[in-house]
Amino acid sequence: MKAGAVESGEISKGAPPRKGLIRGLSIMDFILRIVAAIATLGSALGMGTTRQTLPFSTQFVKFRAVFSDVPTFVFFVTSNSIVCGYLVLSLVLSFFHIVRSAAVKSRVLQVFLDTVMYGLLTTGASAATAIVYEAHYGNSNTNWFPFCRQYNHFCKQISGSLIGSFIAVVLFIILILMSAISISKH
């Protein structure tokens, strides 16, 4: 038997994980957090500034649509704002992981918090998507008529704000997977 060979039943203690891989994942984590923060901020601002008044409003009756008229849209703006704030604050921890790539406990905490924020972001985006779908297509079973034919600008803006939120959802999945890989390499 060769001197360097491993017998069956023995555990090989190969070379420790390269710091370059973990550091590269940490740098990518930092960049993805910035992109996700921009996406959630854009979604919150896009939905939060949505309003339209129809041109045939009278002096006493105004036909207008505002995001705050729908509680689901308020939840969407709130959840995106909370997640954006978290992402900005987590940049400090992400930078710490670039400097100290051997930190494991803080990575576990970050994976836990990322998962919580992923859940919050997904619920806000999914709930808003259901309402946007109803606004575009209505529901004939409940006699809810689509109102996007009248409020065209309003519907375009609320539909567009969903895009940034779902981009952030995908980025959170990538962030969680990258953090898990980073932890497993220690």
Curated annotation (Swiss-Prot):
Q: What is its main location?
A: membrane
Superkingdom field: Eukaryota
Q: Which GO terms describe its biological process?
A: cell wall modification; cell-cell junction assembly
Q: Which Pfam families match?
A: CASP_dom
Which residues lie toward the Extracellular compartment? 48-72, 132-162
Task: List the InterPro entries hit by this protein, alphabetically.
Answer: CASP/CASPL, CASP_dom, CASPL
Name the keywords, alphabetized. Cell membrane, Cell wall biogenesis/degradation, Membrane, Transmembrane, Transmembrane helix
Q: Which residues cross the membrane?
A: 27-47, 73-93, 111-131, 163-183
Question: Which source organism does the UniProt entry give?
Answer: Glycine max (Soybean)
The secretion signal range is none
Assembly and oligomerization: Homodimer and heterodimers.
Q: What does this protein do?
A: Regulates membrane-cell wall junctions and localized cell wall deposition. Required for establishment of the Casparian strip membrane domain (CSD) and the subsequent formation of Casparian strips, a cell wall modification of the root endodermis that determines an apoplastic barrier between the intraorganismal apoplasm and the extraorganismal apoplasm and prevents lateral diffusion.
The protein's name is CASP-like protein 6
Localization: Cell membrane
Q: Which residues lie on this side of the membrane: Cytoplasmic?
A: 1-26, 94-110, 184-186
Q: Does the keyword Transmembrane helix apply?
A: yes
The record's PANTHER family line, in alphabetical order, gives: CASP-LIKE PROTEIN (PTHR36488:SF12), CASP-LIKE PROTEIN 1U1 (PTHR36488)
The family annotation for this protein states:
Belongs to the Casparian strip membrane proteins (CASP) family.
Q: Name the membrane topology term.
A: Multi-pass membrane protein
- CC terms in the record's Gene Ontology section: plasma membrane
